[in-house]
């Protein structure tokens, strides 16, 4: 008689069970990682506009996000993001109070994950030149670790 070669059904079932357990642990971790990186990226995209806003304040111009700024206005030059709601320059709502305070607001949407869609990122400047960042209006699936350390959920 020849000796049998190969795996028994029990051995194959054990391997499938181990792979299932590993997948059950890895998939939620990956989804959290993806959401966290998307929030961090969106915060970075909005925060990158701080330099342009500072330049506008130094030049004494009104900060806008417009395709055709007037002579007294300064276009902050935002490039469209795949993570933010809206299209083009309308993705960032700019509030320039002309007293040195500025507010840049963006809402996560479009291709952002469902756990973070709808969260609002606000980067604001006080008249003393200090910039702050906060995340508000988070969806119910939001987890505290999604917010980067420099932009907490409030």
UniProtKB/Swiss-Prot annotation:
Subcellular location: Fimbrium; Membrane
BP-aspect Gene Ontology terms: cell adhesion; protein secretion by the type II secretion system
Transmembrane segments annotated in the record for this chain: 7-27
Keyword Membrane: yes
InterPro entries: Bac_GSPG_pilin (IPR000983), N_methyl_site (IPR012902), Pilin (IPR001082), Pilin-like (IPR045584), T4P/T2SS_Core (IPR050470)
Keyword Mitochondrion in record: no
Xref: PANTHER family: GENERAL SECRETION PATHWAY PROTEIN G, PREPILIN PEPTIDASE-DEPENDENT PROTEIN D
Entry's family note: Belongs to the N-Me-Phe pilin family.
Subunit structure: The pili are polar flexible filaments of about 5.4 nanometers diameter and 2.5 micrometers average length; they consist of only a single polypeptide chain arranged in a helical configuration of five subunits per turn in the assembled pilus.
Name used for this protein in its record: Fimbrial protein
